[in-house]
Amino acid sequence: MPVVRKIFRRRRGDSESEEDEQDSEEVRLKLEETREVQNLRKRPNGVSAVALLVGEKVQEETTLVDDPFQMKTGGMVDMKKLKERGKDKISEEEDLHLGTSFSAETNRRDEDADMMKYIETELKKRKGIVEHEEQKVKPKNAEDCLYELPENIRVSSAKKTEEMLSNQMLSGIPEVDLGIDAKIKNIISTEDAKARLLAEQQNKKKDSETSFVPTNMAVNYVQHNRFYHEELNAPIRRNKEEPKARPLRVGDTEKPEPERSPPNRKRPANEKATDDYHYEKFKKMNRRY
């Protein structure tokens, strides 16, 4: 009988372990790269120590702005520098960054700028560098006292600035996503509150209805109230005084009454009834009053 050899699989532990190590190294390198990119994108909190050590850079343009025509020091005036001194400012204003535009639109307050300003003013005070404008105090005349306002009339703008700062600080706080569970809870609580409010309103209506007071109280009020309204466009009628009797005198005689025509008397053709005429005249007289 031929001898049958059993075939056994050889272990490939070394090759698989090497592949796993390579994959783990690639993943680790990718993670490190992403972390470095995230760190570069992060905005540094507060004022950096390097910026404080370097201090404020004094540009050459400041000297030109202070004395462009060299009236104090003397010398030749460079007309090229005078013409080109405003170009850099325009280019800087045009290059608006995303952070500055976003903070301006959302009314966000830059705390670092305020901190730097405070540090600069405190350093100037300690070094004794005080601005000349603060030291200059104009002597007051007798007429200047007339233009001064008392303290009770002065409008203080401190309240407005405090409100503005509080709004800016609130807008600078980042929003935190609470998740779907919190939103669902809020929706459920609002629906429960609506149902409770509707139930309370229905109960109030049921309690208010009684057998003595009708439900259509407003309709009854309007129906009965119409009799108390005065007529606005009613014609104003004058009270006609009755004619006073004339006093009798000696020698007065009663006037003879006109002769009454018999009822069956024939009227002439030109004689017409005057009822319509007098009726129209009476209507016109009533319209006047």
Curated annotation (Swiss-Prot):
Phosphotyrosine PTM sites in chain numbering: 147
A GO CC annotation given for this chain: nucleus
Renumbered residue ranges of the record's region Interaction with SNRNP200: 5-58
Spans annotated as Disordered: 1-27, 232-289
GO biological process terms, semicolon-separated: chromosome segregation; mRNA cis splicing, via spliceosome; mRNA splicing, via spliceosome; regulation of homologous chromosome segregation
Broad class of the protein's primary localization: nucleus
Subcellular location as annotated: Nucleus; Chromosome, Centromere
Nucleus recorded as keyword: yes
Molecular-function annotations in GO: U5 snRNA binding
Biased amino acid composition, Basic and acidic residues: 232-283
Annotated Basic residues bias: 1-12
Phosphothreonine: residues carrying this PTM: 253
Location of Phosphoserine modifications: 15, 17, 261
Pfam families in the record: Hep_59
Sorted UniProt keywords: Centromere, Chromosome, Chromosome partition, mRNA processing, mRNA splicing, Nucleus, Phosphoprotein, RNA-binding, Spliceosome
Record family assignment: Belongs to the TLS1 family.
Role played: Plays a role in pre-mRNA splicing by promoting usage of the upstream 3'-splice site at alternative NAGNAG splice sites; these are sites featuring alternative acceptor motifs separated by only a few nucleotides. May also modulate exon inclusion events. Plays a role in spliceosomal remodeling by displacing WBP4 from SNRNP200 and may act to inhibit SNRNP200 helicase activity. Binds U5 snRNA. Required for proper chromosome segregation. Not required for splicing of shelterin components.
UniProt subunit comment: Component of the spliceosome. Interacts with SNRNP200; the interaction is direct. Interacts with PRPF8.
This protein's name: Splicing factor C9orf78
Organism: Homo sapiens (Human)
Source organism phylogeny: Eukaryota, Metazoa, Chordata, Craniata, Vertebrata
